[in-house]
């Protein structure tokens, strides 16, 4: 045991340093703690959702649990395990992106599970937890090593987060580097999944319907959103993937009375190049526009 003591102390020191870095989770956890009794809306999804909704521009108290690489499995665990802390929760907003149903769920050892266990006491490991499950650095050493370097040494890529944990200075990115030049952007490659995954689709759609059933059984209004994408992304989509996704969503809407669809994926009129960080993520300016529009929709 004495042999391991210095190692444990070292990891604790590193994790303490990690916790000093501004992160959205810290602010979200604090907001959940202080405003849980009054939160009426909660958002769930991937980085696209994280970027798109800034609760500052919603009329009701809200929290956005969207996070990079987050799939519906983790979304559902978060909802189930925090619901009792939100006695006035009325609306849940779930992202279903273009290829959400084609991508396998994250494993029970997904590194973000440590994040949610650490900050929100949400156990998504599907097992008994241990001390190490709260240690952020060892959950993803490459990610946190870069974060430590950026914060303590190079002083770059430091996020500024509002009370709700939204990154308000998220304006840089691919399009910024290209100076929002649409001709240059059009010549760039696009990160997009075009491969259909029949097995994942079958599992994911059944699992997602379980989420919808849960919201219905718990008297929650559910809004499914497809988020704005830039034109270069839209033209690269696999039509079969889009059709399958949209067919499932329409079927669910017709089946469950508590469900509404807010589809803005193809809205190229309201959103232009200046609203995007890259072809599939809004920047903080685009998020303000989108959240205000969503607010109007939710108010009707």
Name every feature range the model reports, one short phrase each.
Residues 1-18:
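Hydrophobic membrane-insertion alpha-helices, especially the h-region
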Residues 17-37:
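Alpha-helical transmembrane signal-anchor/signal-peptide segments
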Residues 40-42, 91, 221-223:
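Structural motif
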Residues 41-45, 276:
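Short hydrophobic beta-strand that contains or immediately precedes a catalytic carboxylate
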Residues 48-136:
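Membrane-embedded segments
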Residues 105, 109-218:
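Secreted/periplasmic serine-hydrolase-like ester/acetyl group-modifying domain
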Residues 212-238:
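Active-site segments of SGNH/GDSL-like serine hydrolases
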Residues 239-300:
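Long, positively charged, glycine-interspersed low-complexity recognition regions
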């Amino acid at each position: 045991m004495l042999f391991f003591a210095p190692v444990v102390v070292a990891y604790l020191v590193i994790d303490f340093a990690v916790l000093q870095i501004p992160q959205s989770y810290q602010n979200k956890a604090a907001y959940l703690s202080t405003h849980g009794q009054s939160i009426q809306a909660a958002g769930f999804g991937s980085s696209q959702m994280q970027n798109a909704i800034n609760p500052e521009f919603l009329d009701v108290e809200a929290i956005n649990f969207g996070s990079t690489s987050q799939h519906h499995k983790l979304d559902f665990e978060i909802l189930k395990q925090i619901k009792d802390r939100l006695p006035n929760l009325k609306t849940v907003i779930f992202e279903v992106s273009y290829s959400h149903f084609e991508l396998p769920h994250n494993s029970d050892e997904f590194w973000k599970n440590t994040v949610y266990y650490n900050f929100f006491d949400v156990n998504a490991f599907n097992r008994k937890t241990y001390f190490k499950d709260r240690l952020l650095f060892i959950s993803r050493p490459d990610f946190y090593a870069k974060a430590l370097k950026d914060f303590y040494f190079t002083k770059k890529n430091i996020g500024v987060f509002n009370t709700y944990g939204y990154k308000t200075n998220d304006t840089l990115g691919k399009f910024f580097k290209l100076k929002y030049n649409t001709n240059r952007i059009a010549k760039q490659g696009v990160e997009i999944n075009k491969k259909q995954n029949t097995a994942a689709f079958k599992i994911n759609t059944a699992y997602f319907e379980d989420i919808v059933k849960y919201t219905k059984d718990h008297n929650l209004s559910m809004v499914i959103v497809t988020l704005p994408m830039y034109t270069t992304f839209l033209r690269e989509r696999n039509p079969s993937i889009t059709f399958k996704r949209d067919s499932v969503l329409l079927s669910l809407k017709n089946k469950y009375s508590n469900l509404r669809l807010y589809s803005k994926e193809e809205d190229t009129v309201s959103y232009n190049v200046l609203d995007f960080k890259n072809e599939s993520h809004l920047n903080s300016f685009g998020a303000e526009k989108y959240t205000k529009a969503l607010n109007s929709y939710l108010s009707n």
